């Protein structure tokens, strides 16, 4: 009987340990102090979620009064295709309480997220469109299906977009802003990427509708929580507008590995939005970056005009495709143009081709596989374990 009691106590202890949520990816130089993202377990109901938030608010208030903490508590809640999470500023005692709630799956630090762009080269040639519509290099003409993304909505999740730029006239609207109160593109990065995925002159999907979603400041940085909030808004908007299945989302940004970021983009993809993301510019394995490391999305590395891997581009088995990213000419705020380099420039090429495929009847679930299937195996020195396939729009040229 004593043995049975010991076993019972042991099993109870194991169950208690298993019930505790996991803390993902602690520490790092990019951590935002006292800022956390909390992800709930699958199956948690809206009522359970609200009850948890209420309990956290009470615990936070008690701990704040006890320790004189300046943390603000719960900030935003997210529900992306059934994936429930929230972010907030909490002290360590409150986080310990959250980790011990059996409805919580995991907690992670909120982190800084930055652009995936690099350099500017004035008066550089426009070559990306010609390259993705021909099997051989050196062609300047862009050949594309006349549907050109018509009927598809592309969400540019970035620094904002200059919605008055002639490249987007009649096809763009402002969506939301999760980073500040300035509904403009003070950086230019978001306008540039939008010009590539759907600009009239410089874009791949020239007839697609565009929505500006600002998650990064004029300085080019934001937070994981801010990016997730933007993605949450996109899914909600696409659902409300009946656009799921005919929507794409470009993420030319990234940061350190974040399970929450990866989960958010995966849920957006599963909801019916084709997601293209930049691999990153550290010349490292993209498996350590997010959202590039999310398996469900289409991760783009950067190529040069000579079909080489761009020197800065991340690589690795998680990369789905190479696309033009060095010295890409596109739109700039104020009606002008600008040349930028980075995997930020590769991703919108992929997003545009994906949007064009959606317009032709390819499903969101099949789009990235289709992109990889028709791509050309021409990239030289792609990196260890990395695909050598270069984006191609299937023009037949």
UniProtKB/Swiss-Prot annotation:
The keyword Hydrolase applies. Residues 35-116 form the Inhibitor I9 domain. Residues 20-116 form a propeptide. The keyword S-adenosyl-L-methionine does not apply. The gene is SUB3. The active site is at residues 158, 189, 344. The lineage of its organism: Eukaryota, Fungi, Dikarya, Ascomycota, Pezizomycotina. Its EC number is 3.4.21.-. Keywords: Glycoprotein, Hydrolase, Protease, Secreted, Serine protease, Signal, Virulence, Zymogen. GO terms for cellular component: extracellular region. Gene3D superfamilies: Peptidase S8 propeptide/proteinase inhibitor I9, Peptidase S8/S53 domain. Residues 1-19 form the signal peptide. Secreted subtilisin-like serine protease with keratinolytic activity that contributes to pathogenicity. Pfam families: Inhibitor_I9, Peptidase_S8. It is an enzyme of class 3 (hydrolase). One of its GO terms (molecular function) is serine-type endopeptidase activity. Residues 126-397 form the Peptidase S8 domain. This is Subtilisin-like protease 3. It is found in: Secreted. Glycans are attached at residues 250, 393. It comes from Arthroderma otae (strain ATCC MYA-4605 / CBS 113480) (Microsporum canis). It comes from the Eukaryota. Belongs to the peptidase S8 family.
């Amino acid at each position: 009987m004593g043995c049975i009691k010991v076993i019972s106590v042991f099993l109870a202890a194991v169950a208690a340990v298993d019930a505790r949520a996991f803390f993902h990816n602690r520490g790092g130089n990019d951590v935002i102090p006292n800022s956390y993202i909390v992800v709930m377990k699958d199956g948690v109901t809206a009522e359970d979620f609200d009850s948890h938030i209420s309990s956290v608010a009470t615990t936070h208030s008690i701990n704040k009064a006890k320790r004189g903490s300046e943390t603000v508590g719960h900030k935003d809640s997210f529900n992306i295709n059934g994936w429930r999470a929230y972010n907030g500023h909490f002290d360590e005692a409150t986080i310990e309480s959250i980790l011990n709630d059996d409805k919580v799956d995991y907690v992670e630090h909120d982190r800084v997220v930055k652009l995936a762009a690099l350099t500017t080269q004035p008066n550089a040639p426009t070559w990306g469109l010609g390259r993705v519509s021909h099997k051989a290099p050196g062609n300047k003409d862009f050949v594309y299906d006349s549907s050109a993304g018509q009927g598809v909505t592309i969400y540019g999740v970035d620094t904002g977009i200059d919605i008055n730029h002639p490249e987007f006239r009649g096809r763009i609207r402002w969506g939301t802003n999760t980073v500040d109160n300035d509904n403009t593109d003070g950086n230019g990065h978001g306008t540039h990427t939008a010009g590539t995925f759907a600009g009239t002159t410089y874009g791949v999907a020239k007839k697609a509708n565009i929505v500006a979603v600002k998650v990064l400041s004029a300085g080019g940085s934001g937070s994981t929580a801010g990016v997730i909030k933007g993605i949450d808004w996109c899914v909600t908007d696409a659902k409300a507008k009946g656009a799921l299945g005919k929507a794409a989302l470009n993420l030319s940004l990234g940061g350190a590995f974040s399970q929450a970021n990866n989960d958010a983009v995966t849920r957006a993809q599963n909801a019916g939005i084709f997601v293209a993301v930049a691999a990153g510019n550290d010349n490292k394995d993209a498996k350590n970056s997010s959202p590039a490391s999310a398996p469900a999305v289409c991760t783009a590395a950067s190529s040069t005009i000579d079909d080489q891997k761009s020197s800065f581009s991340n690589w690795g088995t998680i990369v789905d495709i190479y696309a033009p990213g060095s010295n890409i000419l596109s739109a700039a705020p104020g009606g002008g143009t600008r040349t930028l380099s980075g995997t930020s420039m590769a991703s919108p090429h992929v997003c545009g081709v994906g949007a064009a495929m959606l317009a032709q009847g390819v499903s969101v679930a099949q789009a990235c596989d289709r992109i990889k299937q028709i791509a050309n195996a021409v990239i030289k020195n792609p990196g260890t374990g990395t695909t050598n396939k270069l984006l191609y729009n299937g023009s037949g040229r």
